[in-house]
Regions:
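Mature extracytoplasmic or organellar-lumen-exposed domains after removal of signal/transit peptides
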Residues: 25-250
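Secretory targeting signatures
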Residues: 1-27
Length: 250
């Protein structure tokens, strides 16, 4: 798709969303569905991150695969969350369609501009569905991190079972990108005790290293378990006293 045309369409979508979106978050989604919805947005950001890395490296075939994954793999989750908001749903679908059809030989600068506008659309959809006090709650963010790690492990298994080639490379890159997004999410939890945050961050860094080196599945899965065990040691006492922590599942 012509880059200029795609920019115009994306800017137009965002302008419509800003003037027509609902101001109150949709309260109909269960807690677990809200985690899945935000997880799908974070995974989309992971695919965009992986696509950008391949665009910079000139790997257009790999970039193209990453660009196609959000609408192929994640749109159903986003659609299920947005079914009561059909206008925003159609705008998200169109944005992901534009992403899929982006020329993988695009310059990194132009891709950054396109990605920024797509992320604005996704964040606006998120603000419609997820109340701010839920999204900013540290327990919710930790649950999104768990969701990202579950999907990262799934992608790694797909990479191991792929038999090699570009498909395998893309699955490993997806796995790594989802851990990066988990790390970014962790760094937004300012209320978490510094020692706990550092311990969990160290475990995530070790996991990224194992994924990049394409270590055997049992080694990587052990580290996934280590990360989740570290995350599960976090209690209400590990947050600043002025933070109200919600219980998972409600």
């Amino acid at each position: 798709m012509n880059n200029v045309i795609s920019y115009v369409i994306i800017f137009g979508i965002f302008a419509v969303m800003m003037t027509s979106s609902i101001n109150m978050a949709d309260a109909e989604l269960s807690y677990s569905k809200q985690v899945e919805f935000v997880g799908a947005i974070e995974e989309t950001m992971g695919h965009i991150l992986a696509a950008k890395d391949n665009i910079v490296d000139g790997n257009s075939e790999l970039a193209s695969l990453h660009l196609s994954h959000p609408i192929a793999e994640l749109y159903d989750n986003l659609h299920n969350g947005l079914k009561n908001n059909p206008q925003i749903d159609s705008q998200v679908e169109l944005a992901l369609f534009i992403l899929k059809n982006t020329n993988p030989d695009i310059s990194s600068e132009n891709f950054d501009e396109e990605a920024i506008e797509i992320l604005k659309i996704l964040n606006e959809a998120k603000s419609v569905l997820i109340q701010n006090d839920v999204y900013t709650n540290p327990t919710f963010k930790l649950d999104v991190i768990s969701d990202l790690l579950m999907m990262s492990e799934h992608e790694y298994i797909l990479g191991i079972n792929s038999g090699g080639g570009n498909i395998g490379i893309v699955e490993f890159q997806d796995s790594h990108a989802f851990v990066v997004r988990a790390e970014i999410m962790l760094n937004t939890i300012d209320s978490l005790d510094e020692d706990k945050k550092n311990n969990l961050s160290s475990q995530l860094q070790e996991l990224k290293s194992l994924i990049l080196n394409e270590e055997p599945l049992d080694v990587v899965q052990t580290q996934f378990n280590n990360v989740l065990e570290e995350k599960n040691t976090i209690t209400d006492n590990n947050f600043n006293s002025n933070i109200v922590v919600m219980s998972s599942g409600g």
